[in-house]
Amino acid sequence: MKKQKTTSQKRKTGAYCRNKGHRYETKIAQELRNLGFTDVVTSRSESKSMDDKKVDLVDRSGKLPCYIQLKNTVNTPQYHAIKKECPLKDKPFIVIWNKQVKKEKVFGSAGEVVIMDKNFFFFFLSK
């Protein structure tokens, strides 16, 4: 007879991962609003079309200087593949990645990084 997996060994369901991703989108949207981008919302709440274009955060006022895709994953996001799927080319495209690592029974953040084109990075340095 096979042993059943204990709760700590169970693989997280798709719904769990999806909800964790949604919470991360909401968190980053709030952080951007706190920085003065008061019209930033998640694309899930604003525009299915933008969500389909790989844009997770929408700035209804247009002040945000880039398109943002958020990733809350263990593996490194494939920046170039994700960017290629976004048909919007009028603003730079960035990925904010919240690296997940196993911490005892659950996954937690190892830190957050931004992945962007070098020219957009240099643009910020020149300000």
Describe the residue ranges of each PLM region:
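Glycine- and charge-rich intrinsically disordered segments
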Residues: M1-S8, R33
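Intrinsic disorder/low-complexity segments enriched in polar/small residues
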Residues: K3-T6, T13, T26, N119
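Short linear sequence motifs
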Residues: Q9, C17, V114-D117
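Catalytic centers of nucleases
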Residues: R11-L88
